[in-house]
């Protein structure tokens, strides 16, 4: 007798699917390290690259690749309508920023810890929190910090306004991102190493506490979200 899971695997084809529940995506076919997460309702494209225990997929909203365990394919349902991105003007986005900021404050009030690959509450990584906050008001950002930096409109630090993104890392690449709140403060999800192991508010200063100083030393610059990400249809 064929189980529901076995039936789901047998019927899985290269096509667009909806996530029926929150779903983990991994960075390799072994599914040993989390790459990102897909909230219930998201669209993903199942490729024809099947391995023994997983299949390669691409999230439709942000073109992000990953691997889904075949044990989770029962959480997928073939999409009846393809994903279509909404176009937003810069003025539209500006009106929505207070909602994105409010999302981060609400997330901080929940018990949470830093989770590499986390984009579904309560536990996030840095860029996952940014993506989730903006998606909560209908704005899509790319997934990773360096992608978000390239996607935003670069601005001088003196031009910072609440809702802008602040990037940290090495001279070569952005590896961390936070959301500017105003008055020299930003909110972010930081790890255990010189961070807060979760969501917290820090200051852009070299004279603050240890966490603020550590990130300020890695400051790269800032960017303004002026559009919503439109997928390139990667398959």
Residue ranges, per PLM feature:
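...with weaker cross-activation on analogous glycine-rich loops/strands in unrelated enzymes
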Residues: 141-207
């Amino acid at each position: 007798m064929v189980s529901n899971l076995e039936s789901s695997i047998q019927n899985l084809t290269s096509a667009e699917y909806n996530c029926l529940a929150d779903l983990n995506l991994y960075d390799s076919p072994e599914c040993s390290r989390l790459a990102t997460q897909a909230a219930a309702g998201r669209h993903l494209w199942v490729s024809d690259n099947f391995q023994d225990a997983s299949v390669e997929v691409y999230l439709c909203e942000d073109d992000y690749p990953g691997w889904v365990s075949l044990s989770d394919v029962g959480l997928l349902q073939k999409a009846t309508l393809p994903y279509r991105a909404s176009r937003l003007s810069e003025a539209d986005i500006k009106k929505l920023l207070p909602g994105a900021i409010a999302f981060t404050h609400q997330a901080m009030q929940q018990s949470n810890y830093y989770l590499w690959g986390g984009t579904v509450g309560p536990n996030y990584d840095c860029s996952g929190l940014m993506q989730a906050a903006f998606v909560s008001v209908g704005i899509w950002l790319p997934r990773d910090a360096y992608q978000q930096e390239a996607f935003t409109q670069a601005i001088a630090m003196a031009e910072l306004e609440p809702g802008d993104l602040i990037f940290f890392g090495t001279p070569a690449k952005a590896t961390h991102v936070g959301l500017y709140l105003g008055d020299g403060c930003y909110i972010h999800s930081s790890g255990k190493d010189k961070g807060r192991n979760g969501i917290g508010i820090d200051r852009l200063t070299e004279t603050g506490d240890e966490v603020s100083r550590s990130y300020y030393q890695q400051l790269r610059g800032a960017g303004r979200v002026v559009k919503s990400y439109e997928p390139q249809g990667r398959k």
